[in-house]
């Protein structure tokens, strides 16, 4: 008789920028109380005032990359890295190891949880697919991505497009997904897809 404990379900949630990943995580947390580990949250912690990584960023780009309170000017940094692949790679080389340590620490504390969701926008780009047991990709139309970035982040169309094209093409992520969530419609259209994916083990 097989007495091995059931394998922990680790859902890797990813997708293009501004496709609606946070909508999915919010819904799962509210409906199923699933623990959420968020790479974006860890990345923000990595550059908090006084951190070694923020010091390195200021050393590379100058003190004008910080505001008067010593906080990172995210918009200014974005203008640099989303238009320069080499600088983007350098920044990720600083932040990704910190994010990885945060994930490992959090997962070690959640071993008793049946399911954990890891929200990782750069799941494929950072080669973290081995961390998860299944991959969910959130998708929508490219024009919707642009419009959401303009509205949410206050970007110009050119800036929005630069951020989208700096990432792995969404179609390639979809091809590698176990589950595809189409968020090109309303939340009422998305919810049944999330429920179906949740119950499909």
UniProtKB/Swiss-Prot annotation:
Residues of the DPCK domain: 10-201
GO molecular function, one term: dephospho-CoA kinase activity
Main location: cytoplasm
EC code: 2.7.1.24
Binding site for ATP: 18-23
Keyword Transmembrane helix among UniProt keywords: no
Entries under Pfam families matching the protein: CoaE
InterPro entries attached to this UniProt entry: Depp_CoAkinase (IPR001977), P-loop_NTPase (IPR027417)
GO biological process, one term: coenzyme A biosynthetic process
EC top class named in words: transferase
GO cellular component, one term: cytoplasm
Transmembrane segments: none
Subcellular localization: Cytoplasm
Pathway terms, separated by semicolons: Cofactor biosynthesis; coenzyme A biosynthesis; CoA from (R)-pantothenate: step 5/5
Catalytic activity field: 3'-dephospho-CoA + ATP = ADP + CoA + H(+)
UniProt-listed CDD domains: DPCK
Signal peptide (UniProt feature, chain positions): none
Keyword terms, alphabetized: ATP-binding, Coenzyme A biosynthesis, Cytoplasm, Kinase, Nucleotide-binding, Transferase
Function text: Catalyzes the phosphorylation of the 3'-hydroxyl group of dephosphocoenzyme A to form coenzyme A.
HAMAP family with a match to the protein in the record: Dephospho_CoA_kinase
Family per record: Belongs to the CoaE family.
Protein name: Dephospho-CoA kinase
Source organism of this protein record: Synechocystis sp. (strain ATCC 27184 / PCC 6803 / Kazusa)
Taxonomic placement: Bacteria, Bacillati, Cyanobacteriota, Cyanophyceae, Synechococcales
Gene for this chain: coaE
